[in-house]
Swiss-Prot record:
GO term, biological process aspect, one: cytoplasmic translation
A Pfam family per the record: Ribosomal_L2
Protein name as it appears in the record: Large ribosomal subunit protein uL2
This protein's encoding gene: rplB
InterPro entries, alphabetized: NA-bd_OB-fold, Rib_uL2_dom2, Ribosomal_uL2, Ribosomal_uL2_bac/org-type, Ribosomal_uL2_C, Ribosomal_uL2_CS, Ribosomal_uL2_dom3, Ribosomal_uL2_RNA-bd_dom
Organism of this sequence: Variovorax paradoxus (strain S110)
rRNA-binding is among the record's keywords: yes
Length: 274
């Protein structure tokens, strides 16, 4: 995979940095694994805006990705690596020995023709999925479940991974890329290796139009609004906030922690580094 620096033929091209997709499949996705995806534009069922700065963007079909990996003992052959417009990671189309095809998150180094396996007897090889109790301590893992059988919820983005630190009783300690250490049940499954497309962090959009294609609308600063529209608004000429930064509804922002989930607090051994 290569990084493409665009020639400065226009202001939008000047700062753009793209990621090469030459190694990805060029054809259409596997139709039985596609679902329609409708734009909500940040509105709820009443038509009220619940998420600001959403709307427009290119239409995409949703690719149904297998996050459970529960076909134990059945080898799967990787047919191709594909681009997925709905996520930063690439996806791989695998065909099981019984003929079923599924999409999975593509780990780094996976190529067409490779054979993957799931279950407690699977070898320790990139792309194989095992219960955490069967994974050696110190291994790099991704697509980690938080509850057994629920499907992967952690380390699914491009270039992400976690490290298995230790096992104590029925729980294991896993360190995330953020530095946070969590306790996860040893019956939860994880996939060996790290997620592919690690160069995604080097991408530079270059112009606002790319953001619009992604369905993200402009963000207006509160200090340029009127007092009726934002707590930071008003004043003669160019002024600052005049107070601690808040959102349009007066809630503290810029670093104010809002997490309040006592039910899962006990599973966090150490918080991420700020």
């Amino acid at each position: 995979m290569a990084v493409i620096k665009m020639k400065p033929t226009s202001p939008g091209q000047r700062g753009a940095v793209k990621i090469s997709r030459d190694h990805l499949f060029k054809g259409a996705p596997h139709a039985p694994l596609l679902e329609p995806q409708f734009q909500k534009a940040g509105r709820n069922n009443n038509g009220h805006i619940t998420i600001r700065h959403r709307g427009g963007g290119a239409k995409h079909h949703y690719r149904v990705v297998d996050f459970v990996r529960n076909k134990d003992g059945i080898p799967a052959k990787v047919e191709r690596i594909e681009y997925d417009p709905n996520r930063t990671a690439h996806i791989a189309l695998v065909c099981y020995a019984d003929g079923e095809r599924r999409y999975i998150i593509a780990p780094r180094g996976l190529e067409a023709g490779a054979t993957l396996l799931s279950g407690s007897e699977a070898p320790i090889r990139a792309g194989n999925t095992l219960p955490i109790r069967n994974i050696p301590v110190g291994s790099t893992i991704h697509c980690i479940e938080l509850q057994p059988g629920k499907g992967a919820q952690i380390a699914r983005s491009a270039g992400t991974s976690a490290t298995l630190l230790a096992r104590e009783g029925v729980y294991a300690q896993v360190r995330m890329r953020s530095g946070e250490v969590r306790r996860i049940h040893i019956e939860c499954r994880a996939t060996i290796g790290e997620v592919a497309n690690e160069e995604h962090s080097l991408r530079q959009l270059g112009k606002a139009g790319v953001k619009r294609h992604m369905g993200i609308r402009p963000t207006v600063r509160g200090v340029v609004m009127n007092p009726v529209d934002h707590p930071h608004g008003g004043g003669e000429g160019k002024t600052g906030e005049g107070r601690h930064p808040v959102d349009p509804w007066g809630n503290l922002t810029k670093g104010y922690r809002t997490r309040n989930n006592k039910r899962t607090q006990v599973f966090i051994v150490s918080r991420r580094k700020k």
